[in-house]
Amino acid sequence: MRNLKLHRTLEFRDIQAPGKPQCFCLRAEQGTVLIGSERGLTEVDPVRREVKTEISLVAEGFLPEDGSGCIVGIQDLLDQESVCVATASGDVIVCNLSTQQLECVGSVASGISVMSWSPDQELLLLATAQQTLIMMTKDFEVIAEEQIHQDDFGEGKFVTVGWGSKQTQFHGSEGRPTAFPVQLPENALPWDDRRPHITWRGDGQYFAVSVVCRQTEARKIRVWNREFALQSTSESVPGLGPALAWKPSGSLIASTQDKPNQQDVVFFEKNGLLHGHFTLPFLKDEVKVNDLLWNADSSVLAIWLEDLPKEDSSTLKSYVQLWTVGNYHWYLKQSLPFSTTGKNQIVSLLWDPVTPCRLHVLCTGWRYLCCDWHWTTDRSSGNSANDLANVAVIDGNRVLVTVFRQTVVPPPMCTYRLLIPHPVNQVIFSAHLGNDLAVLDASNQISVYKCGDKPNMDSTVKLGAVGGNGFKVPLTTPHLEKRYSIQFGNNEEEEEEEVNALQLSFLTWVEDDTFLAISYSHSSSQSIIHHLTVTHSEVDEEQGQLDVSSSVTVDGVVIGLCCCSKTKSLAVQLADGQVLKYLWESPSLAVEPWKNSEGIPVRFVHPCTQMEVATIGGEECVLGLTDRCRFFINDTEVASNITSFAVCDDFLLVTTHSHTCQVFSLSGASLKMLQAALSGSHEASGEILRKVERGSRIVTVVPQDTKLILQMPRGNLEVVHHRALVLAQIRKWLDKLMFKEAFECMRKLRINLNLIHDHNPKVFLENVETFVKQIDSVNHINLFFTELREEDVTKTMYPPPITKSVQVSTHPDGKKLDLICDAMRAAMEAINPRKFCLSILTSHVKKTTPELEIVLQKVQELQGNLPFDPESVSVEEALKYLLLLVDVNELFNHSLGTYDFNLVLMVAEKSQKDPKEYLPFLNTLKKMETNYQRFTIDKYLKRYEKALGHLSKCGPEYFTECLNLIKDKNLYKEALKLYRPDSPQYQAVSMAYGEHLMQEHLYEPAGLVFARCGAQEKALEAFLACGSWQQALCVAAQLQMSKDKVAGLARTLAGKLVEQRKHSEAATVLEQYAQDYEEAVLLLLEGSAWEEALRLVYKYDRVDIIETSVKPSILEAQKNYMDFLDSETATFIRHKNRLQVVRALRRQAPQVHVDHEVAHGPESDLFSETSSIMSGSEMSGRYSHSNSRISARSSKNRRKAERKKHSLKEGSPLEGLALLEALSEVVQSVEKLKDEVRAILKVLFLFEFEEQAKELQRAFESTLQLMERAVPEIWTPAGQQSSTTPVLGPSSTANSITASYQQQKTCVPALDAGVYMPPKMDPRSQWKLSLLE
């Protein structure tokens, strides 16, 4: 749905050269045009508007002096820096334009009709006046000569046995002669020049020749290959014209055919068979086709037509029409009228070989015209909700308009079409009223159509599709307000209009009665911006006039003009890339440079064919896209792979070469953020990016809606709802409390309904009643309930593109479901509890702890509803609905838990349960005593606490059963609450509880339980087992044990305490209860409690122990500390040095283990969006129970593997991590010795072991200093990020770069995260003894 829009026009008028122009060619590298006349060659530079070279062919005798000579072909030879010229007299001349030397490289005595070079300029083909073809090499050596008329069909002649042909078919009463009709050939057309026409395929492997057959006098097309072998001959086509053009892509050969009532452009295949056609918009014998030309990329077919003389026609015209094809329909996109007499008569036209949409035209009055077009989509501005998202497509004198807000129909169909008297060249939409449009036709008239409330249909507006017959049209179509002619006010402009068929370009509708347009000066590189203002007249209501109210001259060629519909800013782009701001609303009509935020004038590095003005982060910027897919924002190139873009509702939408569509919010964006996102340096989120079909382009975006219309290369349309547009629109609706619109959109597009609450929980909970009233559907509210989950989808599934400045309060207790269910239930009960009965039941079921008992009670209450109440729900309906939400067995069990057998029977009857299964069970229960009955029910339902409560009320005769239940289900704590402490049942339960704790090796709680119930012997046994010496000695005192038994008990307790490395407590027990202070001193020395040992020595006056035990123990401890420090220091230095080596190797070889890391990296992003339909809650619910055992086993294996993978073996994959762990352990072990070292330093100094004390203090200080200096080197920020920093550079590979980015995405495991943090060392710890310094 694209049109051709005039990009720029370059005109060189009144070229000063001799003779009359006959043909021309382009010199692409030099940027000049070489024109041939009956006098010679003239090279002109159209940009500088000067004649560069004149070469006379008359002086050398190649052309006659009387002016009767003719040049039939000119070709620029790129590799020879020369030009090849062929004359009608038969000479082939090579001319060096630098030296102006002429050389005749060959001559044909009979004369030359056509000269045609192959596209690769390796072969030259000449058609002679004797109806022969001569093929030559680029060095002008003759390869072969063949007759142009051939009797043979060619090498591609069809072989058939006749089955299915007309000759083998039954022809009824007409007889067999009808199988062989005699087809009389038609003569060539009267206006046929009868000359051969040659065209080459784009790759130069084949060429086609159209000639008039001598025998039949009708035209035929023959196809030859590069070896000059005839391949095929076309089928007989009556009325075949002389024009011939082979599509460069190689698929079709275009020609023309006169039919009885029309004139067609027909297409032939290489085998000579017809393959498609389209009809020209002219009557029979109205025009003739002089030439057909395909552009370089085969996207546009140019047709040069000329009016045939008629008796009643005084002025004849010629036309250049540009046709394109899409969805198998041919569109006339541009029509350029020229005259057939005077200076404006066309001599020849050529497509540019480099720029596909550039057309060169040469006229007889030495006037040269060069026009550049570019592809554009003419769509409405989309600045309001009333904009219908109109897109206009030009098709000759029709404008096909599609209203995408209401209908999506594929081209060439449309919503409605506008009928214009002349072919249309440009369509524009109003900048302030997007549904109004204006049409500029080939006669430079502007037809203005406006959307209003007129009831009468306009005759120039026709509905598409069924045409409205028998249907009510909900669409308001526009009506023709007036057709305006443009009045420039002087004859000079009118004369220029005769020469330049495209006088006006970039027509822009800025106000209701004001248009802007661009024209170009034919004498200098200047452009003129015209203000076209409506002249009000009461004479003619249908025909109006536009006057040029003012004009502004701009130095430079304008190649772009766009107006922002919101800010009314108008940007002008010049050919050199400079962007200007045109202050068209200012009284002075000034033009000033467009400046960025830094005050620097904006200049595009490359000319942009599409330009828009948008506000990005509060700054008005110019966006541009080149024909080479380079995308600019102001003067910054932000991407080089953009195929199309659009700006709508503060969003920027782009499609890329990687077949994605990305959407960015411009309100809070910045230029750097957009550049980073579009360059691919940051991974795009799921909301921004969407995969699209290959080659998709943006057609339009429906304003304030979610629809994005894309067009595929073959022409069909696709409507997508981009996630970013959808979420943005939903957020707007939720902010406006338009819950119904948001809900319908989310339901249709499968957006998780949790977003309704999570977008703003506080606002939603305050407006729950509004939500219920707007939805007003039990089914939809139930759907909302079923999708609720505790997850905050604004943090997981749909994070906002811009972080909110005000954080919305969440639910810290994680009871989101309960809050919503309670609020919704209260609102529904207040509005209409009978209507929303099923939804109220759902609110109870969906709570974190389903309230099934309450649900069943509410169902039971429904029995009182009136049967004729239309809004009420019956018990049967409610139960059937509940069975959809809850498992039937679970519902049956909960109904049984209410102890109401009527409710149980009601649930069972609605389920699929067999009465033989539940009736005997229920009958048995009914016969039991109430408490025992409820105990049986609770036990059946595994509600053992309730069952115990009911059983305890059954009496002492059931205590044995009760005690067994307590033991089986470990209900000791609950049972102790049910009996009085002085009861025998309490004692029995306590004894059983204590025995249970002893079996579980929980000795201290068991001792407390035994002590509480008076079982002192068992309590002493328990306290003794756990080493609780205070409690054990207390119990011993209560048992009134003798001193000897207490001493023995004390020794036993001391042994237990020593095993637990509690030497000080063991010494206290021996000293106070066994009176064995010598053994107590030895235990204190063993536990390094030096000062406490000395206290006991002096307390009991046993100074001799100092020499025998204390001093040797102190010296031995000092020696052990020295050995430990030496070992730890050596280990620390070894690991530190190895870590440096490992890090150096990693920097040198970043690709180590890359393949393993990539293979186990994050999952690939190659799945389609529709593959994630099943929600996470559904999958977790399906597999959580069955896989619990597997999960436990796999987690155990993972922990085991986690321990094994951190190996200190050199070369292991995670050696660096293992070294960090080992170094951290060494530092922590040394740090823990500070208090112990200070204690031993004091006693060493006390007993005059000063040298040993100084040695230990120096060694410990040296070790600590070594570690303090090394910690910043080992645990550096760069070292922490080295594993996640992308590895780039000349030594990197594809795998290494991929792995580094995969590591960026992967979080550090929780087990490894602490390794990257340096161990804590307290420099303020006072461990040193100042007396030793």
From Swiss-Prot:
Residues 1192-1210 are annotated as: Required for binding to tRNA. It is found in: Cytoplasm; Nucleus. The keyword Nucleus applies. Residues 886-1333 are annotated as: Mediates dimerization. GO terms for biological process: tRNA wobble uridine modification. Disruption phenotype: Conditional knockout in male germ cells results in defects in wobble uridine tRNA modification and defects in synapsis and meiotic recombination which result in increased apoptosis and complete arrest of gametogenesis, leading to male infertility. Conditional knockout in female germ cells results in female subfertility with reduced litter size although ovaries are morphologically and histologically indistinguishable from those of controls. The keyword Phosphoprotein applies. GO terms for cellular component: cytoplasm; cytosol; elongator holoenzyme complex; nucleus. Phosphorylated. The modification Phosphoserine is found at residues 805, 1172, 1175. In the testis, expression is restricted to germ cells during spermatogenesis with no expression detected in somatic cells such as Sertoli cells or Leydig cells (at protein level). In the ovary, expressed in oocytes of primary, secondary and antral follicles (at protein level). Widely expressed in adult tissues with highest levels in brain and also expressed at all embryonic stages. Residues 1175-1209 are annotated as: Disordered. Keywords: Cytoplasm, Nucleus, Phosphoprotein, tRNA processing. Component of the elongator complex which is required for multiple tRNA modifications, including mcm5U (5-methoxycarbonylmethyl uridine), mcm5s2U (5-methoxycarbonylmethyl-2-thiouridine), and ncm5U (5-carbamoylmethyl uridine). The elongator complex catalyzes the formation of carboxymethyluridine in the wobble base at position 34 in tRNAs. Regulates the migration and branching of projection neurons in the developing cerebral cortex, through a process depending on alpha-tubulin acetylation. ELP1 binds to tRNA, mediating interaction of the elongator complex with tRNA. Belongs to the ELP1/IKA1 family. PANTHER family: ELONGATOR COMPLEX PROTEIN 1. Homodimer; dimerization promotes ELP1 stability and elongator complex formation. Component of the elongator complex which consists of ELP1, ELP2, ELP3, ELP4, ELP5 and ELP6. Interacts preferentially with MAP3K14/NIK followed by IKK-alpha and IKK-beta. This is Elongator complex protein 1. It comes from Mus musculus (Mouse). The lineage of its organism: Eukaryota, Metazoa, Chordata, Craniata, Vertebrata.
